[in-house]
UniProtKB/Swiss-Prot annotation:
Molecular function via GO: structural constituent of ribosome
Family annotation (CDD domains): Ribosomal_L30
InterPro entries in the cross-refs: Ribo_uL30_ferredoxin-like_sf, Ribosomal_uL30_bac-type, Ribosomal_uL30_ferredoxin-like
Gene Ontology cellular component terms for the protein in this record: cytosolic large ribosomal subunit
Identification of the protein by name: Large ribosomal subunit protein uL30
Organism lineage: Bacteria, Pseudomonadati, Pseudomonadota, Alphaproteobacteria, Acetobacterales
Family that this chain belongs to: Belongs to the universal ribosomal protein uL30 family.
UniProt keywords, alphabetically: Ribonucleoprotein, Ribosomal protein
Top-level taxon of origin: Bacteria
Keyword Ribosomal protein: yes
Organism annotation: Granulibacter bethesdensis (strain ATCC BAA-1260 / CGDNIH1)
A Pfam family per the record: Ribosomal_L30
């Protein structure tokens, strides 16, 4: 199954609480942190919600 490499590129300071919670749900809490996640509809929805705070790349690598 394809995977997504998600990297936080901006701070959550001054953002809505829901955006901070979404980043925590993605496993991100500091700028520069990267996670490799399964490409599922729920993960895609979460990445769209905070697209201005993260960088997303499609990949096939294992964790």
């Amino acid at each position: 199954m394809p995977k997504l490499r998600v990297t936080q590129i901006a701070s959550v300071a001054g953002r809505k609480p829901g955006q901070k919670e979404t980043l925590i749900g993605l496993g991100l809490n500091k700028i520069g942190r990267t996670r490799v996640l399964e490409d599922t509809p729920s993960i895609r929805g979460m990445t769209r919600k905070v697209a201005h705070l993260i960088q997303v790349e499609e990949t096939n690598e294992a964790e």
